[in-house]
């Protein structure tokens, strides 16, 4: 997509998280984080250099993006991707926001303590907040009262790269909460709920800087008179669990991680405060953005432009199902390989590799996907229809047998052992 925009006279840039192999292609300018990036004093890669920059990643990405906007060639239209690390693991807030939500008790989801029935893969994952999070690395909990030494923390470099002054302020902000925790002597359900609160408070404090950064960019566009003719898109690459099923992270095809935020602004074209209820995917972004810009959409693009839908000229897309396929196994969180489709009402998933399990949900009757209906006789016609539709979608996307290769038993065994070693002794 950036190549197409550049070939049509646009200035193009990407700033922030890249997390792909190779250098960015099709961009006139790029300044990207190394790998996932670090929250504090991150390393930035440019065409001819890699340098560590003192500061907070979200603020730096915002500032670099504003600098590029101010220095761009104003005679050309532009395409800019601002890609934040936040709120990726391990949710380290800016120093000014560390204690932002200390006085708040966030409501935990009803499913925080789940009862999985006929959901084998959901039961066997390793992404439960109160079982699998590293208390030091993820929750910033200390090893004992009166010390700043962190509890389980297999990746010390996230904190070690802080300057002495940054670490001093960080420890001063977290020490009172950590000491108060050890005084409470929590166990069982109370401890599990406490860990959920720690996670949510850090997560929300981390995204506070994203909110500020987005606001600064929107303010700049308005101040320069660019807001009336600039499509602004706020989105992500997936959803995220904030305690649903007791989980953090993503990966599963269940709704909290399958759905993702998508906010768009283009005054005079997209009706204000309008809401669109159609099934879109991130592969639809490229054809949509190109059509908005009046650029021809290449015939080999698999996505569908939803321009006319967000403009309010159409209510439906030419799509009755969306496809999902998760391959990363054995890997972090040990979410089993699975694929499936979703329609307006139903969802079917097949978990495979070291298991063979189907799940089927009526999202109208069971939006939280608690009741796997795969064996329910009342739904066998719908299940048959969904399996046929799944086959046709896989044919459309040319899904090959190579994508169903199984992991070796040894690799799975080694992964479990490795994660157990990294987990260390939990606070119980």
Mark where each language-model region is:
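Residues forming the ATP-binding cleft of Hanks-type serine/threonine protein kinase domains
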Residues: 364
């Amino acid at each position: 997509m950036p190549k197409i925009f550049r070939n049509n006279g646009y200035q193009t840039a990407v700033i922030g998280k890249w997390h792909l192999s190779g250098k960015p292609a099709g961009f006139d300018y790029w300044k990207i984080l190394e790998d996932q990036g670090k929250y504090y004093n991150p390393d930035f890669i440019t065409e001819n250099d890699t340098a560590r920059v003192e500061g907070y990643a979200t603020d730096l990405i915002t500032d670099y993006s504003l600098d590029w906007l101010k220095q761009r060639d104003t005679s050309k239209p532009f395409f800019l991707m601002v890609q934040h690390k936040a709120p990726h693991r391990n949710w380290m807030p800016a120093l000014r926001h560390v204690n932002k939500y200390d006085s708040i008790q966030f409501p935990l989801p009803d499913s925080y303590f789940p009862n999985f029935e006929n959901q084998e893969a959901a039961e066997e994952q390793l992404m439960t907040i109160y079982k699998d999070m590293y208390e030091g690395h993820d929750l910033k909990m200390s090893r004992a009262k009166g010390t700043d030494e962190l509890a389980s923390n297999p990746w010390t470099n996230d904190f070690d790269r802080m300057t002495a002054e940054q670490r001093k302020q960080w420890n001063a902000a977290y020490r009172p909460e950590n000491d108060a925790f050890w005084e409470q002597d929590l166990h069982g359900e109370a401890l599990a709920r406490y860990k959920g609160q720690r996670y949510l408070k850090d997560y929300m404090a981390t995204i506070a800087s994203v909110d500020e950064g987005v606001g600064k960019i929107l303010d700049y566009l308005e101040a320069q008179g660019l807001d009336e003719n600039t499509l602004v898109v706020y989105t992500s690459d997936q959803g995220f669990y904030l305690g649903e099923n007791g989980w953090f992270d993503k990966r599963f095809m269940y709704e909290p991680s399958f759905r993702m935020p998508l906010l768009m602004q283009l005054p005079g074209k997209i009706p204000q405060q309008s809401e669109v209820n159609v099934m879109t995917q991130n592969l639809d972004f490229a054809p949509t953005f190109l059509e908005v810009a009046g650029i021809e959409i290449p015939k080999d693009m698999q996505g569908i432009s939803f321009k006319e839908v967000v403009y309010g000229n159409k209510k439906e897309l030419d799509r009755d199902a969306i496809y999902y396929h998760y391959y990363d196994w054995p890997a972090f969180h040990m979410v089993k390989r699975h694929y499936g489709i979703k329609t307006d009402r139903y969802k079917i998933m097949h978990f495979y590799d070291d298991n063979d399990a189907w799940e089927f949900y009526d999202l109208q009757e069971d939006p939280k996907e608690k009741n796997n209906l795969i064996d329910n006789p009342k739904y066998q016609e719908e299940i048959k229809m969904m399996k046929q539709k799944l086959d046709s979608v896989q044919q459309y996307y040319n899904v090959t047998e190579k994508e169903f290769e199984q992991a070796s038993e040894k690799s799975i065994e080694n992964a479990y052992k490795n994660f157990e070693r990294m987990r260390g002794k939990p606070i119980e």
